[in-house]
Amino acid sequence: IARKAGLRAVPHGGELLGPEHLREVLDFLKPTRLGHGVRAAESPDVLRRVIDEGVAFEVCPASNVSLGVYSEASGVPVRTLMDAGATIALGADDPLLFLSRLTAQYETLREQGFDDAELAALASSSVEASFADGASKRTWKAEIQDWLAADPSNDDDAEAHGA
């Protein structure tokens, strides 16, 4: 119904109900983006299918922990999804409900050992997964590359790199 009306739909799946639920979401809803989907990491076949079908994951570590999917943010399989080649849009998911902020999600990944290049790749992946127009995506990706190229030894650039 949503597609026929010209609306975008992002079904939620693969969070509380696991990878089998993702199979159903993929079969019946044919999404281009999934709300969560993190438990695809538990099934190599499901994860490969999501990637092969070009479906992006919206990964929200704070809500995954708040909902008890993982006991701590380090358990959220962002690294597994990223290493498999998944398109990931890092998100805060209902900031008023979970009291989460997007910058805190990036800080969490930094604490888990993600370097500047990996954080920039996640930011670019988030832009790519967005429903923004092509010109906006190009602009934002260029800004991400500018951030990555900035010299953290310069006082003005150091703060941007979390120094």
Where are these regions (language model features)?
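Charged helix-capping and loop-helix junction motifs
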Residues: 20, 71-79
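Active-site core of metal-dependent hydrolases
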Residues: 1-69
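Structural recognition of alpha->loop->beta junctions
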Residues: 25-40, 80-88, 105-117, 121
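Mid-to-C-terminal alpha-helical segments outside catalytic/metal-binding sites
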Residues: 104, 114-163
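Alpha-helix N-cap/helix-start motif
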Residues: 18, 43, 98-102, 137
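Hydrophobic alpha-helical scaffolding
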Residues: 12, 36-37, 71, 92-96, ...
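Short, hydrophobic/aliphatic alpha-helical segments
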Residues: 1-3, 76-85
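Short acidic/histidine-rich active-site segments
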Residues: 10-16, 81-101
